Amino acid sequence: MLTDKFKKNADALRHKKLFLLDMDGTIYNENSIFEGTLDFLSQIEKNGGRYIFITNNSSKSVKDYVEKVNRMGITADASHFYTSSQATAFYLQENYPGQTVFCMGTRSLVAELEQNGIRVVTKPEDSASVVLIGFDTENTSEKVRDTCIMLGREVAYLA
């Protein structure tokens, strides 16, 4: 019988094939992996399942997350992640194809968008028809000013 941390029956998990897992506060806290995480992920794979880490934190790229969890001992590659940055890139491709996006966000967010074929600018440009604001751990007053300038124009606004 498969049991959880509290010795309760967890056999129902054996038949699940896909686990969507949040990261910070669920499998780790900042840079410390929670006890039992590696065993849990290993058990998923032993049972023929797959796990995907999901996050609404747009400040890091998939590459950043892969490196972070690998440092903690978790074997994962880009196929193990779905981030809000990726979802935003897909949304922009679908709803604003070929348009230029002004982005107020981290360098990782900008890189993630560019890797997904989005033309991104970080300074006010007339060519930008979409303003995107992401969680920005690198925010400056200049970025806020530039974003305000862009929002004063006729642009689509996403956050």
Predicted regions and their residues:
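HAD-like aspartate-dependent phosphatase fold
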Residues: 1-23, 27-159
